[in-house]
């Protein structure tokens, strides 16, 4: 990914509509940089009032090392800005971000519009669901602020969503309770996915690389 960003379908979608689309696979970013980048299961950066992702899904394993708020990682999109909209869509899988300060979440990493610095131009989420285990992030949006343009969002009660923090010079792993939306159990999640959209994802071959960082949530207490 590096300084360019990456998405399962597109690195950047500007004033574009993506409907009834899906991605299944692994995305790995091992590049170390302080520059901004955006990584998403479907789209790295979704920008513009006419930019829409609708009736879509991503089944992902994302391994990343985002380490600042302008480095974004999301199960559907990394950065959603300038009134762009994700609706009737969901992500499932795992996101393992090995550093602590990125904007990381199961649906969208970052919604705030940096150019206008106004919440009325932030990205929008409607009828979205996160069924994603997340390390060092949140379930729905990775950056929380007042007045977020999010309606009808859902997450899986059984997902492990954690952040690693420092408390009194001790590294502590704590559950992330921000941006959970309406929390559903496993049976409700399955029903809600079908209600949101009924896309089927084609089978793909496993991508094997020497730089893969595996998500191992069994070690989280």
Language-model features, listed with the residues they occupy:
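Predominantly extracellular beta-rich ligand-binding scaffolds that present long acidic/polar faces
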Residues: 1-221
């Amino acid at each position: 990914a590096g300084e360019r960003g990456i998405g399962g379908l597109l690195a950047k979608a500007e004033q574009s509509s993506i409907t009834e689309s899906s991605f299944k696979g692994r995305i790995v970013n091992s590049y170390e940089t302080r520059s901004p980048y955006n990584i998403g299961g479907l789209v790295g950066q979704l920008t513009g009032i006419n930019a829409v992702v609708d009736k879509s899904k991503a089944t992902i394993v994302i391994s990343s090392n985002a380490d600042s708020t302008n480095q974004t990682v999301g199960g559907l999109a990394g950065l959603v800005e300038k009134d762009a909209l994700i609706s009737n869509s969901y992500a499932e899988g795992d996101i393992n971000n090995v550093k602590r300060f990125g904007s990381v979440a199961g649906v969208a990493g970052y919604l705030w519009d940096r150019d206008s610095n106004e919440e009325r131009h932030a990205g929008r989420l409607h009828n979205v669901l996160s069924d994603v285990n997340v390390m060092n992030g949140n379930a729905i949006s990775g950056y929380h602020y007042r007045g977020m343009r999010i309606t009808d969002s859902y997450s899986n009660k059984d997902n492990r969503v954690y952040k690693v923090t420092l408390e009194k010079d001790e590294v502590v792993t704590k559950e992330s309770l921000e941006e959970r939306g309406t929390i559903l159990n496993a049976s409700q999640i399955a029903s809600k996915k079908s209600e949101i959209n009924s896309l089927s994802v084609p089978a793909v071959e496993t991508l094997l690389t020497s730089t893969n960082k595996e998500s191992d949530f069994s070690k989280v207490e």
